[in-house]
Amino acid sequence: MKKIIVTTCLLATGFLLTACGESQSSNESQQTTIQFMHSSVEQERLSVINELVADFEKENPDIKIKQVPVEESAFNTKIVTLARSGKLPEVMEVSQDFAKVMDKDELIDQMAVQNVIEESGEDNYYDGAKNLVRSEDGKSYIAAPISGWVQGIWYDKEKLSEAGFSEPENWDDILKIAQHFTDKENKQYGIAMPTAEGTMSEQAFSQFALSNGANVLDDEGEVTIDTEKMREALSFYQNLSQYTMPGSNDVTEIKDAFMNGTAPMAIYSTYILPSVYEAGNSENIGFAIPTQKDQAVYGTVSGLTISSGLDEKQKEAAEAFTAFLSQPKNMEKWVLMSPGGAQPVNKQVVELDGYKENEVIKSFGELPSEIASAFDEVQVFGLVGEKNFTKMGDITSSGVIGKAVNQVTVGNEDVDQSLADAQKNTK
């Protein structure tokens, strides 16, 4: 407890009247202070977070929130450093992948997170968003989703329509459209797609693999890269890459090709939408999901997690603050820090007037609702049923999938050999 020294209440008689300091002293001593670490360092975003914190503290005068804003590029390293020194913040914004790392090291209070999700209404979240933050055994959660993004195939509705094509519904449709629009002599391509040796290539390829029933792990957590279903998917991806730009394509090349009209289709995340809006082309963009045996959307979520080992007051305060941020009206404010790019993970948010009437969201018509509902179709490597294997994070970090994609697309190497090597290097 802090000692409050009251100097202004000293009277000439030498008596100390404590009345003027008692109220403030009592309030401060009863407050529980917790830290909230997040990556919203930009002034506009920080203003939104400040407002949310102020609203919470007004409703909960016995809890004080101390913010710890950290640049996204340094965020995970900062958490590791704080964890080693035993100084983890009580509440943290985390990606689904890093939440797995933290959970593996027993840094997350799963029960506290579970309490928040139950209080917020488990059924209010899109199933895919919930699955991404399930614990490895599928029985609990490692973060409460607050926003996310999904990836699929974006297409120019006008160009496809003029060429006699409707929205691509399966692999064959995608291939036919890509073939039609490719004119390499004039540097026109059918689809802008990831081929670089990196995470984006793994993410893009995963949609085709999972839509064909191929996963990197089975329900026992065993590696299943070198399989017939995976071979079919990678062979298709290799074939499709004939109709993309030459070389190793990553984020910048793909976005630029779609935005400047070099390609009428692109595999990209929802973070392409703000640029489409700024270009005044909101009504002309469509969204398709790679489909073969099944639909498969790649998606990711940002969540709020609660650190383990807290005392009872800290834990209660952390749960209360996380539950507050998980209320639809507050999730709406969080998502609208990046309208179009960040997507709601709670079904109630898309029904709020503030979300629907946002200038950017409104410009896309029914598309935002269609995209948000795509969270129900989210599938990712390592998520098998309700099991969310933490070892998938290590496999992604190793780069074996992205390397295989790059080998067969840019390097035109043999699919069978690339998968065999990936399987061998993963075990």
What are these regions (language model features)?
Residues 112-126, 195, 212-232, 278-280, ...:
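Short, solvent-exposed loop/beta-turn-alpha elements that line the ligand-binding surface or hinge
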Residues 100, 275-282, 293-300, 304-399:
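C-terminal lobe and pocket-closing loops
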Residues 55-125, 158, 162-169, 264-265, ...:
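Extracytoplasmic "Venus flytrap"/periplasmic binding protein-like
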Residues 102-106, 127-169, 194-219, 298-307, ...:
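Periplasmic solute-binding protein
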Residues 177-180, 220-248:
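Glycine-centered hinge/linker elements that transmit conformational signals in sensory
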Residues 39, 99, 203-204, 235-323:
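Extracytoplasmic/periplasmic substrate-binding proteins
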Residues 96-150, 175, 285-288, 367-372, ...:
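Hinge/lid segment of periplasmic solute-binding proteins
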Residues 161, 373-427:
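Conserved C-terminal helix/tail region of periplasmic/extracytoplasmic solute-binding proteins
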